Amino acid sequence: LTVKELAMRVNLSTSPTFDRQKRLEREGFIKGYHAILDAKKTDNGMTVLCNMRLKRHSQMLMDDFMVAIQDIEEITECYNTSGEYDFTLKIQTRDMESYQEFMRTKLGNIDSVGYFHSVFVMKEVKNTHGVPVKLG
């Protein structure tokens, strides 16, 4: 979306639209710009939500886990959650075989992991990749 297209959508001229966009970036409201890829076309069409529990609750184990997952490319999202599980991970793999390999060689090798429960996504129904914003 160009600044000109955005300006037309918000009914402003390009200069104030550009200024507002830059201000929102500076103030941290806009964190970045991303292309949204079709996981199936990238040969990573299997989505798994993995609910994970640490071996025990300690800041050190939590920190170790959060550091350990940063460079694991199959983990595309990670949320620290309340309730029965400590974290929910969104994992993208090619198929069941590659997911099993991922669990054996990557997630299963993180010392702080105590238990995990995998939920396999059958169909993505909604994914807006955004945050709702009330205008006005």
Q: What do these predicted regions represent?
A:
Residues 1-136:
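A compositional/biophysical signature of low hydrophobicity enriched in polar/charged and small residues
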